[in-house]
Swiss-Prot record:
One of its GO terms (biological process) is gluconeogenesis. PROSITE patterns: PGLYCERATE_KINASE. GO terms for molecular function: ADP binding; ATP binding; phosphoglycerate kinase activity. Belongs to the phosphoglycerate kinase family. InterPro entries: Phosphoglycerate_kinase, Phosphoglycerate_kinase_CS, Phosphoglycerate_kinase_N, Phosphoglycerate_kinase_sf. It catalyses: (2R)-3-phosphoglycerate + ATP = (2R)-3-phospho-glyceroyl phosphate + ADP. HAMAP family: Phosphoglyc_kinase. ATP binds at K197, E319, G345, G346, D347, T348. This is Phosphoglycerate kinase. It comes from Francisella tularensis subsp. novicida (strain U112). It holds the Pfam family PGK. It is found in: Cytoplasm. Pathway: Carbohydrate degradation; glycolysis; pyruvate from D-glyceraldehyde 3-phosphate: step 2/5.
Amino acid sequence: MSFLTLKDVDLKDKKVLVRVDFNVPVKDGKVTSKVRIEAAIPTIQYILDQGGAVILMSHLGRPTEGEYDSQFSLEPVAKALSEIINKPVKFAKDWLDGVDVKAGEIVMCENVRFNSGEKKSTDDLSKKIASLGDVFVMDAFATAHRAQASTYGVAKYIPVACAGILLTNEIQALEKALKSPKKPMAAIVGGSKVSTKLSVLNNLLDKVEILIVGGGIANTFIKAEGFDVGNSLYEQDLVAEATEILAKAKALGVNIPVPVDVRVAKEFSENAQAIIKKVSDVAADEMILDIGPESEKRIAELLKSANTILWNGPVGVFEFDNFAEGTKALSLSIAQSHAFSVAGGGDTIAAIEKFGIKDQVSYISTAGGAFLEFLEGKKLPAIEILKEKAIR
């Protein structure tokens, strides 16, 4: 690794500032999904075991920066963490002027976005945060693509900055899949829009043997192949771009199995009847909401040959049971595969949970935007600053 990891750093009697991703759903003052909190436990526990004091920072939701708003308070998260780790967790509402914490203790700071200057990573705020600790640990991959005070600025000004256990595992899994994949490699890119994933598709073309498109993205590719998509979600202005990607894939020998059959409906509704049709038969008043059984079989066959699988996005509107078959079949193909598999993004995680394949995916990334930017080949500011600090 080109940056320091938690295990490279002396933590005894040190105040350790940890940027975690505790942006979790809270309803009626209770945390409703603890996945992200649980993911941070190994880092927190390691610091405590090494004799350090833990100061946790995170954002929650999108409050107006610089203003306190009780609905975005991290106090319920501190309580949830205390229950999970079975230790007291102090809560610091006003923390920028100093945090009272001793070795073996945990403090959860209030939402970083209540501080003016967080998003722009102002020097004043960054220096103030850095002065609270001796060591900074970045463990929130989900925010690594943002150069903010609690992810980037603090690392710049604190004496020692390193990656936490979760972040280290995340980068290792993604690098294994993207930089040194065992071939053949397959990538699944689904979701509603080509525009948000265009650079991902282009970047992956040079790395994969199989590129599977799904959701609204697939509709744009179906249109690029000359078929009408009726009332389906697609992007007319990107049809030419999709045509170029298909041509480039052909030249590179990359297989893009554009759906040959689909499940359509007359309306976008949970109760709509799913009708299976060839792509050439989609009527003007119909919308494509899932891939069809023939397309499922083609994908399953292709994935059997893969040694590395990267998955971002569903292939249909899996939230509606009538249009979940394609994503379910894809999930089961990945679950049954011997390949090293990495999955990421909110919808992908929801699909993994819905179809119960969590234990069959090699690595599940909790990140959304950062996961996509990594797939695009972009540099992530919060990772880059850790690399710079390691050289100094």
